[in-house]
Regions:
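Intrinsically disordered, low-complexity segments enriched in small residues
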Residues: 1-254
């Protein structure tokens, strides 16, 4: 786990292989509450296949099916899970401005197509997987510089459309911060989106947080991600997730 799990961020996750996260349900916070930093396992045995030929035949059949499928053979390999951004937006299912609507006017700017043509360095595959939908990215032409893995589809809508943000560099930077601190990007982005709606409805005041927090403000979104990772000040409210944040202002339905 990262610093977020150690200090009690409710949506802290368990990270393995540098950037791969067991992101949901706050399992990183559970480990942190037990003063458990990591679990390391090294196997000593092997796996014996009962019928090697049948196993190989089944594997080749699965390989062919995956390669011939337009989603697993083309879309995911070329654009990663971010291939879903434009698809979901066109179907009206892309959570936008804290899910007040399902269509985002800036979807193309945060799509898999745009990511592939701007910050993608190379694809990456999970062990044994032929789809190779992982994204290794680097930002060098923006003040939001950095490098790492992602963002995935869920991260793009949570830190992007849900916050009204079409700045792909800012979204990718916030994703890097979440990875480094060990925070679930879905809850992190959804919590910022909730805070933005509460701010625009006048429930959260600028005097309380020391800055404006409107939908579409990329700098404010990145700052909120940094605050929640610290679990201090207003960040301590953010670190409890969207439901508890909204409930603290008397509107848990937000």
């Amino acid at each position: 786990i990262g610093p977020a799990g150690e200090i009690g961020v409710h949506f802290a996750c368990i990270v393995n292989d540098k950037h791969r996260a067991a992101g949901r349900s706050g399992v990183g916070m559970v480990m942190g509450s037990k003063n458990l930093k990591a679990v390391a396992v090294r196997g000593t045995g092997g796996v014996k296949v009962a019928n090697p030929k049948a196993y190989r035949d089944a594997a080749l059949e699965s390989y062919s099916m995956l390669k011939e499928n337009p989603v697993t053979g083309e879309g995911l390999g070329a654009l990663g899970t971010a291939v879903l951004v434009n698809i979901m937006n066109q179907s009206g299912g892309l959570p936008t401005r804290n899910a007040q609507t399902g269509t985002f006017e800036g979807a193309e700017a945060i799509s898999g197509e745009t990511l592939a043509s701007s910050y993608l360095k190379r694809n990456k595959s999970c062990m044994g997987c032929i789809i190779c939908c992982g994204r290794v990215t680097k930002i060098s032409d923006s003040r939001y510089g950095g490098d790492g893995e992602g963002p995935e589809y869920e991260t793009l809508w949570a830190l992007g459309a849900a916050c009204g943000i079409s700045d792909l560099a800012a979204i990718t930077k916030a994703n890097y911060i979440c990875n480094e601190f060990g925070m679930d990007t879905i809850t992190a982005g959804s919590t910022v989106a909730c805070a933005m709606e509460l701010f625009e409805k006048g429930l959260i005041k600028e005097e309380e947080i020391g800055m404006s927090l409107k939908f579409g403000d990329a700098d404010a979104m990145v700052k909120m991600i940094e605050l929640m990772a610290s679990n201090e000040g207003f960040g301590a409210k953010l670190a409890q997730g969207s439901y508890r944040l909204a409930d603290s202002y008397g509107v848990p339905e937000r």
